[in-house]
Amino acid sequence: MGWLYALHARSSIARGRALQANHWINGVCDQVIMLACLRQGLPAHEGRGVDDLPAGLRHSLAETLVRELDARELRRAFTAAVGTLLAEAQQVDPNREQRLRKTVWELVHTAHGYVIPLGR
């Protein structure tokens, strides 16, 4: 589901819907927290195990927090959220992560204004 939240986050950023983008970026992070907690054998419901995750992952999650509701900051947090999502997906299911990687990074690139040529 994280990729779907990423799609909505990217669309919200493009439309200038800052609070909505923040909502969807947080949704990406919620999916990362759930996956990481399950993988670590921690309570996943309502983020109850998040503070017990390894320090490096907690740091990565902190980087996904939106600090300001401007487009540049939303893109920064979105990029961090997608990177953290893919890193966790790699730990849980490398084959699925590989299938999602290109598409999800294209969402990030287009959120930053880069044009992805058709047919790629």
Where are the language model's segments positioned?
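Conserved nucleotidyltransferase catalytic core and NTase-mimicking acidic/glycine-rich helix/loop elements
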Residues: M1-R120
